[in-house]
Amino acid sequence: MTKEPIYSPRMLHRDPDSPRPVLPTQLTSSTLRCSQFQTNVFCLRERDLLERFTSEVAQLQGRGESREFSFLLSHQLAEDLGKAFTEKAMLQTILDAEAKLPTGSVKDVLGLVRSMYALISLEEDPSLLRYGYLSQDNVGDVRREVSKLCGELRPHALALVTSFGIPDSFLSPIAFNWVEANTWSSV
């Protein structure tokens, strides 16, 4: 009986034989907000983690460990890979929705939300530094850009929350009147 491969290269959404995306060393605001850069960094991270995971599992199996125990020993890579796959799928869903919108303010706001999602995902993922996808300076650039995006999204915050259709009873009082929620009488 032949062993089934741990994964199929077809699991990758991109052609596994295609060249790896190359990330710029200097990250500008426009680069960080570029959907192609965001797609490239998410695909590079997923592809590299998949290769690392399969290599580690294969090495452990080569030393006589069972496939199941090899998976257990590789849990950190498996966790990072699962997160990378999910975040890439979410980014692609946002990009697909954004592509269907006509040019205008809604598309512009969705672009800001997409950039916020992508950059927060990158900012909060320690595997980006652990495996060298981004430098410490790059992570600092990402953090600064997230702050800028927060400022740009602030005027749209109420409309964004309303667009999700969340019932008022599920929202904190601060969502309705920030000034009233933070007065001394209510604190």
From Swiss-Prot:
Report whether Oxidoreductase shows up as a keyword of the record: yes
Region Disordered, as annotated, extends over 1-21
Q: Where are the transmembrane segments?
A: none
Q: What is this protein called?
A: Putative acyl-coenzyme A oxidase At3g06690
- Leader peptide range in chain numbering: none
Per the UniProt entry, what are the Gene Ontology biological process annotations, in alphabetical order? fatty acid beta-oxidation
Per the record's keyword annotation, is Oxidoreductase included, yes or no?
A: yes
Stored InterPro entries: Acyl-CoA_oxidase, Acyl-CoA_oxidase_C, AcylCo_DH-like_C
If you read the UniProt record, what top EC class would you report for this enzyme, in one word? oxidoreductase
Q: Give the keywords, sorted.
A: Fatty acid metabolism, Lipid metabolism, Oxidoreductase
GO cellular component term, pick one = cytosol
- State the family it belongs to: Belongs to the acyl-CoA oxidase family.
- GO MF term set: acyl-CoA oxidase activity; FAD binding
The source organism is Arabidopsis thaliana (Mouse-ear cress)
